[in-house]
C-alpha cells in the first residue's frame, strides 16, 4: 500500500465508524502511514500468547493488546459536535486543522 496522508495525529481522539468496534472512541497511540493503519487505545483488542522468560523477568501468559485498524475506519472527534471531518484554515506555517461542522480548532488536541 502506498504512503497515506492523513489529518489524524498521535494523541487525537477518534471514533470508530466501521468494523467490530464501531461506536467506540479512543486516543490514537500510533499512526502507521505507510500501511494506512493506526493504533487506537482499547480498540481492536487481540490476545497475544507470551512465553515466560526468566532472564528478562517476563512471567508469560495471555496478554491483551491493541491491533492496528484502517485509518479509513475512524473519524476525528470534535469536543463540541462529536465525530467530524477535518477542514483546513490558513496557509503555509499558519495552517491549522478545524472541525468541518462547527469550525472549532482541532490543532491543540
UniProtKB/Swiss-Prot annotation:
Keywords of this entry: Ribonucleoprotein, Ribosomal protein, RNA-binding, rRNA-binding
GO cellular component entries: ribonucleoprotein complex; ribosome
Signal listed as a keyword: no
CDD domains: KOW_RPL26 (cd06089)
Pfam families, alphabetized: KOW, ribosomal_L24
One biological process term in Gene Ontology: translation
InterPro entries documented for this protein: KOW (IPR005824), Rib_uL2_dom2 (IPR014722), Ribosomal_uL24 (IPR003256), Ribosomal_uL24_KOW (IPR041988), Translation_prot_SH3-like_sf (IPR008991)
Residue segments, region Disordered: 1-24
An example molecular function term from Gene Ontology annotations: rRNA binding
Top-level taxonomic group: Bacteria
Gene3D superfamilies recorded: 2.30.30.30
Function as written in the Swiss-Prot or TrEMBL entry: One of two assembly initiator proteins, it binds directly to the 5'-end of the 23S rRNA, where it nucleates assembly of the 50S subunit.
Subunit structure: Part of the 50S ribosomal subunit.
PANTHER family reported in the protein's UniProt record: MITOCHONDRIAL RIBOSOMAL PROTEIN L24
Assigned protein family: Belongs to the universal ribosomal protein uL24 family.
Protein name: Large ribosomal subunit protein uL24
Organism: Koribacter versatilis (strain Ellin345)
Protein encoded by which gene: rplX
Amino acid at each position: 500500500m502506498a504512503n497515506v496522508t492523513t489529518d489524524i495525529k498521535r494523541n487525537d481522539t477518534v471514533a470508530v465508524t466501521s468494523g467490530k468496534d464501531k461506536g467506540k472512541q479512543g486516543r490514537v497511540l500510533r499512526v502507521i502511514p505507510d500501511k494506512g493503519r493506526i493504533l487506537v487505545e482499547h480498540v481492536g483488542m487481540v490476545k497475544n500468547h507470551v512465553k515466560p522468560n526468566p532472564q528478562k523477568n517476563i512471567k508469560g501468559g495471555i496478554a491483551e493488546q491493541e491491533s492496528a485498524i484502517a485509518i479509513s475506519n475512524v473519524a476525528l472527534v470534535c469536543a463540541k459536535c462529536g465525530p467530524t471531518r477535518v477542514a483546513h484554515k490558513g496557509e503555509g506555517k499558519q495552517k491549522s486543522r478545524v472541525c468541518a461542522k462547527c469550525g472549532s480548532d482541532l490543532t491543540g488536541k
